[in-house]
């Protein structure tokens, strides 16, 4: 029930606004302020709390509740 390819809004292949392939403002290829190379606080290389390598709660490798590998509740 935490499918990484969910059609929700937080999976990596999601058509939502937070996936890496998303056209939203949080994907790694986004021109927004939350991509992995961004100096913001949500990219995977960021020191923030939402990147996949972060200790936060939204990255795919996070122990939080929104990443595709998470034990959370958003990928369904």
Curated annotation (Swiss-Prot):
User: Which residue ranges have biased composition labelled Basic and acidic residues?
Assistant: 1-68
Q: Which domain of life is it from?
A: Eukaryota
Q: Does the keyword field hold rRNA-binding? A: no
Does the keyword section mention Repeat? yes
User: What is its subcellular localisation?
Assistant: Parasitophorous vacuole
Q: What is its main location?
A: other
- Any one GO CC term of the record: symbiont-containing vacuole
Name this polypeptide is given? S-antigen protein
Q: Which UniProt keywords apply?
A: Malaria, Repeat
| Biological role | S antigens are soluble heat-stable proteins present in the sera of some infected individuals.
Q: Which organism is it from?
A: Plasmodium falciparum (isolate Palo Alto / Uganda)
Q: Where is this region: Disordered?
A: 1-76
Mind giving the lineage of the organism this protein is from? Answer: Eukaryota, Sar, Alveolata, Apicomplexa, Aconoidasida
């Amino acid at each position: 029930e935490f499918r990484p390819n969910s059609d929700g809004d937080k999976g990596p292949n999601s058509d939502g606004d937070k996936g890496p392939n998303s056209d939203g403002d949080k994907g790694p290829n986004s021109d927004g302020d939350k991509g992995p190379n961004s100096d913001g606080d949500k990219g995977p290389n960021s020191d923030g709390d939402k990147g996949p390598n972060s200790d936060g709660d939204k990255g795919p490798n996070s122990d939080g509740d929104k990443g595709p590998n998470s034990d959370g509740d958003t990928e369904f």
